[in-house]
Amino acid sequence: MTLQEKIMQELNVKPSIEPKQEIEKRVGFLKSYLKKTGAKGFVLGISGGQDSTLAGRLAQLAVEELREEGIQAEFIAVRLPYGVQQDEDDAQLALKFIQPDKSFAFDIASTVGSFAAQYQSVTGEALADFHKGNVKARVRMITQYAIGGQNQLLVIGTDHAAEAVTGFFTKYGDGGADLLPLTGLTKRQGRSLLEELGAPERLYTKSPTADLLDEKPQQSDETELGLTYDNIDDYLEGKAVSSEVAEAIEKRYKASEHKRQVPASMFDDWWK
């Protein structure tokens, strides 16, 4: 088995999918997990990008079906901007498409700013922009878990195969969640699900961005990764890619293994 094949198997990626069936399976997963845990619904941060739009719509469909079955469940969508978000119109368009039961908005700027100021006061040095970006992601996670805990809701994560293979998420930030309905999907497969669901086209054709850096606002994921999502998706779907692309993806995959595992202990073998 090649490393490419091993990665495909580990991340549960299929070379091709049928969007309608995938939607049904993933909504079914959300419903089954909620019933198993006894929780009362879901919470998810909505950015206006492809991944949270898709996960949010799946969550809303799941709770609506549960209510039709006589099980009370709700979905809370939460906006978590850092000050004024440049693509706020997209976030509002995503909420209009998702139609969540409830939506809240928390501006995380003051919380992040207070921490950054305290960090500089205590250590004598400014928090680097990259690490401040990770603080933003983790404050968003804390907010979602506060809402979830207060309302007995499960926190949904938006991680998918293209992020998992590259480790392109913040550990205990956007990587902190209770369940992941997009697992196994490549970026283009996620787009096909949104097309099937009738999402506004601009929400899945826009350039994806984590938008965590003050110094590089709206920097695209592809610029930060040095790889295109088409390259990553081709690799994950078992297609031929250049040796340079394969090496870059595999290097990131190996370096980010710790992000796909629970914290290491001396009894684990994965890190050896």
Swiss-Prot record:
Gene Ontology terms: biological process: NAD biosynthetic process
Origin: domain of life: Bacteria
Residues noted as binding deamido-NAD(+) in the record, renumbered to the chain: 138, 171, 178, 258-259
Enzyme class: ligase
GO cellular component terms attached to this protein's record: cytoplasm
GO molecular function: ATP binding; glutaminase activity; metal ion binding; NAD+ synthase (glutamine-hydrolyzing) activity; NAD+ synthase activity
Keyword tags: ATP-binding, Ligase, Magnesium, Metal-binding, NAD, Nucleotide-binding
Binding locations of ATP: 45-52, 158, 187, 209
Catalytic activity: deamido-NAD(+) + NH4(+) + ATP = AMP + diphosphate + NAD(+) + H(+)
Pathway in which the depicted protein is active: Cofactor biosynthesis; NAD(+) biosynthesis; NAD(+) from deamido-NAD(+) (ammonia route): step 1/1
Reported function: Catalyzes the ATP-dependent amidation of deamido-NAD to form NAD. Uses ammonia as a nitrogen source.
Subunit architecture: Homodimer.
Name of this chain's protein: NH(3)-dependent NAD(+) synthetase
Record lineage: Bacteria, Bacillati, Bacillota, Bacilli, Bacillales
